[in-house]
Amino acid sequence: MRADRRIVGASKWPLAIDPAKVGTYPADTKSGAGYFYDDVLEYRVWVHPDKGGEPLNGDHDYFIAFAQCEPAEEYSKRIAGAEPPLVLVRQFEWVDEPNRGQFVPEKGERITEWQVGWLQGNKRTATSIQEFLKHPIEAGP
């Protein structure tokens, strides 16, 4: 697995909280959910050899990790078999939805992959979860 820890100019999206750790997080994480994030850990571009990607991990899928979204987007557009970037986020508090419309606040540490667009407006603040529970929405991460 490879990592690009560089920060290149301004970014539309949050940067990795610790660029030195980009590429060190586990490949197997949760996927989606939680509604709020605390930290961006890295951006990931998953590459699929069965869809034309270079077989760097035999015929198994793999990802390249980035500290910044824009280089990840550029990479995903020029590499065969690559998906658009995902973002690995850390959550210390989040909202679980065990059943549609049933929202449960949770605390702990959770690492999950999100669609990059879910970052917009979903950085957790001291009151985010309480406000969400007053007026829940069924959309987003």
What are these regions (language model features)?
Residues 1-61, 69-141:
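Conserved NAD+-utilizing ADP-ribose enzyme module
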Residues 65:
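Basic, glycine-/proline-tolerant helical and adjacent loop/strand elements
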